[in-house]
Amino acid sequence: MPHADAAQIFDKLCADLYVPAARFVLHIDSDTVLTRPLAFSDVFDPRTRKPLMPRVRYAPGSEAELRWRAVTADLVGIEAEDLEFQFMTRQGLCYPRAFYGTFRRAAERLHGRPLSEWLVDRFASTKGHPASEFEALGAFAYYRGGRDQFAWPAVTQNAASSFPALQKLSWGGLDTTLRLVLECVIAGASTPGNCETGLGKVS
């Protein structure tokens, strides 16, 4: 696949192929560290034992709406005005392994070609403005028949992002301060806030 971002998105949409014996797949980005051991309730609803899929209503005119709403609706086959929620709300999103294949097959039937081709063309036609794998998986589940596979808490953006992880943008590499903050958290020496206080705030 010629575009690196398109390739990593497609890679995540094929996560099931990497772990054939797993029942579920939990995604945590490579620029993210956990701030404590995960509890079952961080990932699954304790009552239903289904993966948590927090959803946040799109704010009209917001960056999230402008960036994700139309392309997500196009990818999953619904009207943009019917897509009320965003689903890329936090790190630690989890999906049943079988769900990925269901999504890929449905997307390929809808668009009449391999999903990898659709992603490459999307990148080319928009000069690199991507679809989001997590927005697409969430929207497909909510609007196209997968609601029974997840628990759907409707939350605010702040509550949705309360997953115990620290994510720092690393596209430009790790500078000295950021590296020290991440090493501090990984070492378990302190909380993220204390690590940042001692080393200087990292945005």
Question: Model regions: which residues?
Answer:
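Short aromatic/hydrophobic "clamp" motif used to bind/position activated sugar donors
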Residues: 25, 31
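A glycosyltransferase accessory/donor-loop signature
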Residues: 110-203
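Nucleotide-sugar donor-binding/catalytic module of glycosyltransferases
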Residues: 6-8, 32-42, 137
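Non-transmembrane alpha-helical segments in soluble domains
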Residues: 13-16, 104, 138
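Active-site-proximal specificity loops/subdomain of glycosyltransferases
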Residues: 1-18
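Aromatic-acidic/polar surface patches that form glycan- and anion
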Residues: 4-8, 92-93, 126-133
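Conserved catalytic core of nucleotide-sugar-dependent glycosyltransferases
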Residues: 35-124
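Glycine-rich phosphate-binding loop signature in dinucleotide/nucleotide-binding domains
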Residues: 19-23
